[in-house]
Amino acid sequence: MTTLVIHAPYHRVKSGAKSFSAVLATGIGDGYIITPTEFNVLNSSPNISVVVLDKDRRQRAEGILVNLVPTKKANNGGQRYDVYIKDLKTFPYKSASLNRNGVTVIVC
């Protein structure tokens, strides 16, 4: 099973990022930089789960990946993707290590 973990931190809401509750309500995480290596792992894996974290407020939700839609490129050239998620449900908080883009891909 492959899991995509994305971070929706409360402290980024002031600068225009979508809040954890907005991701939970819409099922869309906006503009996450996913490296080509991470994308290839996700693209070749069936049944990908998604974990949405807010480490600031210690919140966690889990769902199923529906689609990764490329959006604009980041200033560093990294490709940004909107992450579409279905069946999001909240769970007790459990942290995960993230890269500097607020993303990690876990393959079990």
Positions of predicted regions on the chain:
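Compositionally biased, charged N-terminal/linker segments
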Residues: 1-44, 55, 90, 97, ...
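A broad, low-specificity signal marking well-ordered, structured residues that form hydrophobic/aromatic
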Residues: 3-4, 50, 82-83
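Short amphipathic alpha-helical surface micro-motifs
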Residues: 43-48, 64-68
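Aromatic- and Lys/Arg-enriched surface recognition patch
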Residues: 56-108
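Short aromatic-glycine motifs in intrinsically disordered, low-complexity regions
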Residues: 48-58
